[in-house]
From Swiss-Prot:
<dbReference type="GO" id="GO:0004520">
    <property type="term" value="F:DNA endonuclease activity"/>
</dbReference>
<dbReference type="Pfam" id="PF01867">
    <property type="entry name" value="Cas_Cas1"/>
</dbReference>
<dbReference type="InterPro" id="IPR042206">
    <property type="entry name" value="CRISPR-assoc_Cas1_C"/>
</dbReference>
<comment type="function">
    <text>CRISPR (clustered regularly interspaced short palindromic repeat), is an adaptive immune system that provides protection against mobile genetic elements (viruses, transposable elements and conjugative plasmids). CRISPR clusters contain spacers, sequences complementary to antecedent mobile elements, and target invading nucleic acids. CRISPR clusters are transcribed and processed into CRISPR RNA (crRNA). Acts as a dsDNA endonuclease. Involved in the integration of spacer DNA into the CRISPR cassette.</text>
</comment>
<dbReference type="GO" id="GO:0003677">
    <property type="term" value="F:DNA binding"/>
</dbReference>
<dbReference type="GO" id="GO:0043571">
    <property type="term" value="P:maintenance of CRISPR repeat elements"/>
</dbReference>
<keyword id="KW-0255">Endonuclease</keyword>
<keyword id="KW-0238">DNA-binding</keyword>
<keyword id="KW-0464">Manganese</keyword>
<dbReference type="InterPro" id="IPR002729">
    <property type="entry name" value="CRISPR-assoc_Cas1"/>
</dbReference>
<protein>
    <recommendedName>
        <fullName>CRISPR-associated endonuclease Cas1</fullName>
        <ecNumber>3.1.-.-</ecNumber>
    </recommendedName>
</protein>
<keyword id="KW-0378">Hydrolase</keyword>
<keyword id="KW-0051">Antiviral defense</keyword>
<feature type="binding site">
    <location>
        <position position="233"/>
    </location>
    <ligand>
        <name>Mn(2+)</name>
    </ligand>
</feature>
<dbReference type="GO" id="GO:0046872">
    <property type="term" value="F:metal ion binding"/>
</dbReference>
<dbReference type="GO" id="GO:0051607">
    <property type="term" value="P:defense response to virus"/>
</dbReference>
<keyword id="KW-0540">Nuclease</keyword>
Length: 326
């Protein structure tokens, strides 16, 4: 049985009775085939029993929680079954060694930038971006501090958003990237997709031997899986941004799917459902992998990226970020 993500939008109770997981809401009680669940995303007010959490932990199923506004709150991260002390030590050493950390941080930024360039060319708004990248890549290579790397990344992203705006319809311009709260519809859409993508990457990291809290571009900190932030730089342009662009240009997402709240703009529940339908379809789409010579889903590409990072950390093969060929 192919495992799938389960999204819970309605309020209710998630509990275990004997060896069956149930979700009960105002519409009734529904048994869930736990063997077919890969991970769970909770957007409603859901009470989860300790027995249900114990059952989910046994099955290795992460649960990601989002608040009323669609912002990521946190994850139930089951005890890891793929532990490797040797890899964790190597992962930490690459963080502690400034040169090794800089190599990886720069590669994440480079990969992200090249994927942004791919998007702009696809949308026919790439004027001047390639030349700008050449200049900023020179700055990137000469950077000696992570803060300098982050500064280059921020400038690349700013130029990217400015050009992307030229491809977007009126009423869905980014104008300026704003987050908490997003100040307009496009910012709300991008933030919502990025939040879901981050949680997806956390699930993929759970299924590897990598420690999700040891990262290189983003500073490791408490209360976040910072390695997921590193990997999200690669995938935001080619997953989240492409979905956002398609939804607004094809008129699938409309102004009515947003609401004003928190001095900003947020998706309605119906809007979230529309976006997540497109998101899940996108992750399930297959592309022909040039190295593996076979079709893999876009979600699988995230896991493969983590495996490439592992090979780099253990000295098998230098990491090269995914640059979209599709």
């Amino acid at each position: 049985m192919r495992k799938r993500s389960l999204t819970l939008f309605s309020d209710g109770n998630l509990f275990r009775r004997e060896n069956t997981l149930y979700f009960e809401n105002a519409q009734g009680r529904k048994p869930l085939a736990v063997e077919g669940i890969y991970d769970i995303y909770v957007y409603g007010h859901v009470n989860i029993s300790s027995q249900a959490l114990h059952f989910l932990a046994q099955k290795g199923i992460p649960v990601h929680f989002f608040n009323h506004y669609g912002h990521y709150d946190g994850s139930f991260y089951p005890r890891e079954s793929l532990l490797s002390g040797d890899l964790i030590i190597k992962q930490a050493k690459h963080y502690l060694d400034q040169e090794k950390r800089l190599i990886l941080a720069k590669l994440f930024v480079r990969g992200s930038a090249l994927n942004m360039e791919k998007n702009l060319k696809r949308w026919k708004v790439a004027d001047g971006f390639s030349g700008l990248l050449d200049e900023l890549f020179e700055e990137l290579e000469s950077a000696r501090k992570i803060t300098e790397v982050m500064n280059v990344e921020a400038r690349i992203r700013g130029e990217y958003y400015t050009r992307w705006d030229n491809a977007l319809p009126e009423g869905f311009k980014i104008v300026k990237r704003t987050r908490r709260p997003p100040e307009n519809e496009m910012n709300a859409l991008i933030s919502f997709l990025n939040s879901r993508l981050y949680a997806t990457i956390v699930s993929e990291l759970y299924n590897t031997q990598l420690a999700p809290t040891v990262s290189y571009l983003h500073e490791p900190g408490e209360r976040r899986f910072s390695l997921a932030l590193d990997l999200s730089e690669i995938f935001k342009p080619i997953i989240a941004d492409r979905i956002a662009n398609r939804l607004v240009k094809q008129g699938i997402i409309k102004r009515e799917h947003f609401r004003g709240e928190l001095n900003g703009v947020l998706l309605t529940k119906e809007g979230m459902k529309v976006v997540l339908k497109a998101y899940n379809e996108e992750l399930g789409r297959s592309v022909k992998h040039p190295g593996l010579k076979k079709n893999v889903t876009k979600q699988r590409l995230i896991r493969l990226e983590a495996y490439k990072l592992i090979k780099h950390l253990v000295g098998v093969k230098d990491y090269e970020p995914l640059v979209a060929w599709f």
